[in-house]
Amino acid sequence: MKHFLEISQLSSEQIESLLQRALYFKHTKQYPSYSQSIIANLFYENSTRTRISFELAERHLSMSVVNLDLQTSSETKGEAIEDTIRTLAAMGIQYFVIRHKQDGLQQNLANKLGDTVHIINAGDGTHAHPSQAILDMVTIVEQKKQLDKLKIAILGNIKHSRVANSFQCICSKLGVGELVLISPEIWQPSQVHFGRVTDNLNEGLEGADVIICLRVQRERLLQDDHLDLDFYRNNFALTQKSLSYAKPDAMVMHPGPMNRGVEIDSEVADGKQSCILQQVTNGVYARMAILESLIGS
């Protein structure tokens, strides 16, 4: 692969290869060395999990790592991001992990600069978060092998979620049996890539093998959508009661950060069915697999 931009651009075989390579790294702890490769992390949005996970993945692969401090960079003087990348590429940096609030920015950069650099999308606006989809699927297949037999439910603000967009795509590519998108009507997407939409929490969770909770974006609640937290919690939170509609061994997942007591109760987030910390662990190995697939291409 030249770039890693969105799941829809990958074949099912490429995705399967990334999943298996991530699990190989996790179980063997045998990491190749790519010490001649230099990578820069450019995060124009706040991040804990994704940023640190990518950096750990890079260091496990013995890459030389540059973390750009946007507060002290020429970006504060108005430098365009493409000029920043051209400048860093002239210094010998080949790989760029980028998170940005603008939908499609990484694709545009790849179109303009793709002959000389490799672009990795660490999240663009509400559009895509492909590495999250890979790590989520690594977490699922580690426990539940037959994807075509699974019912997976995504719960929350589907409309504004890059996580939900990328996960729909990966479920379609890998032939997941059933995907249900559970959301209040005001947060339901105008376009569904894969699966079906419902505003009935209990029906959506009925018999689910995997439940993925999405963060309630409080800033959108207050400014745009006029949906109050009490309504959401009473009708869409993942509690012990609502979890009981799923299968007894259902996996509970969340991309983080969590709003405990809003979209998910602590008893569920910390309970025996929770795989949230496994997602965090697997994120490092998934991103190692992604980076390795770009090196030498």
Swiss-Prot record:
Documented EC number(s): 2.1.3.2
Reaction equation(s) it catalyzes: carbamoyl phosphate + L-aspartate = N-carbamoyl-L-aspartate + phosphate + H(+)
Gene Ontology biological-process annotations: 'de novo' pyrimidine nucleobase biosynthetic process; 'de novo' UMP biosynthetic process; amino acid metabolic process
Matching Pfam families: OTCace, OTCace_N
GO molecular function: amino acid binding; aspartate carbamoyltransferase activity
Signal peptide location: none
Positions contributing to carbamoyl phosphate binding: R49, T50, R99, H129, Q132, G256, P257
Lineage: superkingdom: Bacteria
Alphabetical UniProt keywords: Pyrimidine biosynthesis, Transferase
GO cellular component, one term: cytosol
Pathway(s) it belongs to: Pyrimidine metabolism; UMP biosynthesis via de novo pathway; (S)-dihydroorotate from bicarbonate: step 2/3
Enzyme type, top EC level: transferase
InterPro entries: Asp/Orn_carbamoyltranf_P-bd, Asp/Orn_carbamoylTrfase, Asp/Orn_carbamoylTrfase_sf, Asp_carbamoyltransf, Asp_carbamoyltransf_Asp/Orn-bd
Residues engaged in binding L-aspartate: K77, R162, R215
Gene3D superfamilies reported for this sequence: Aspartate/ornithine carbamoyltransferase
Subunit structure comment from the entry: Heterododecamer (2C3:3R2) of six catalytic PyrB chains organized as two trimers (C3), and six regulatory PyrI chains organized as three dimers (R2).
Function: Catalyzes the condensation of carbamoyl phosphate and aspartate to form carbamoyl aspartate and inorganic phosphate, the committed step in the de novo pyrimidine nucleotide biosynthesis pathway.
Family, per entry: Belongs to the aspartate/ornithine carbamoyltransferase superfamily. ATCase family.
Protein name: Aspartate carbamoyltransferase catalytic subunit
